[in-house]
């Protein structure tokens, strides 16, 4: 699912970019740009161009993915793809043993995924990104937490992260008809936060000595 062809179009015209890839990969990129799909005797893939909220309905519910990666702009910049309604549709196509992965550590996103029945884990920060307490989120439908091993790059949410899900930051983005504008989605959430009795996010930050820079969307 992708709304904008321009990045791929630009990349295919950029010789420096193309030199980074094997000719076979370049062929796949070109086919996805011109035909929206690629297939040979070993591999096939496709891309649905347009508003993801509309295009996701094209994917049959019978198709289940082992891996779903959410790489949209942050919830504040592009809330349309982080709403409880859209994520509900996304998770319907997740294999029961599959993984949903995103760079986002947003409390709203994590709480939504948990409310949709997924187990939530945090991606351990790399050394170079130590100022951030998480590099993202892994969500799994069925996973025995007791099987987590030290060499995994994800782990249970810390107490600090769990408490983040009890603040106003965890209030979800909503888009009931999957056609709302960015501004409308954000406004509705702000209104809901205003009247919520949940702990303020500032209080949570103060308790844990956090700054806005260390809290990723």
Explain the meaning of each model-derived region.
Residues 67-69, 96-104:
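Conserved beta-strand signature within the Rossmann-like core of class I S-adenosyl-L-methionine
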Residues 45, 63-72:
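Short SAM/SAH-binding signature in class I
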Residues 110-135:
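Conserved Class I S-adenosyl-L-methionine
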Residues 10-60:
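S-adenosyl-L-methionine
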